[in-house]
Amino acid sequence: MLKKSSKKSIKSQEKYMRPPWDAYFMEIMRSVAKRATCDRGRASSVFVKDKQILVTGYVGSPVGMPHCDDVGHQLRKTIHEDGTITEHCVRTVHAEQNAICQAAKRGVPLEGSTVYVNMTPCRTCAMLLINSGIKRVVAANKYHDGAESEMMFKKAGIKLEYLSEDVVKYKKQKG
């Protein structure tokens, strides 16, 4: 015969706390980043609408092309007006761009969605996100060269939220 215990177990006394939606989708974004194939960011994105995932993307080379992790970076130098020289890897497609491509291939509208990203999207990705009709960007960190993107999102009426004020900076980059 089993005896009923009058004492509740410690485990049953601890109340389980479900994560808020933003934390939940950011954790998924971090998992998606594990598929990234360029170590200069390991960026990813998750597009969500009405608490449902629409599409995900991660930084990687175009289909069938070699990956940075396998053959190294394809760096391009830029000489800026102030004389500063920076380098940017051009082998890969950015996470936001890959997700937008996946949405287009599958016929998934992104209008009115929220995108969860590692850092402030670059200028080109910001333009694509604006034209995709997103309403909100949630970024884990700031991008060292993200000021122009921040301004563009503001002008477009897109809400940009940061979970951290930490700034992501790459080697040989301005900012």
Regions found by a protein language model. Give the residues of each.
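Zinc-dependent deaminase catalytic domain
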Residues: 1-175
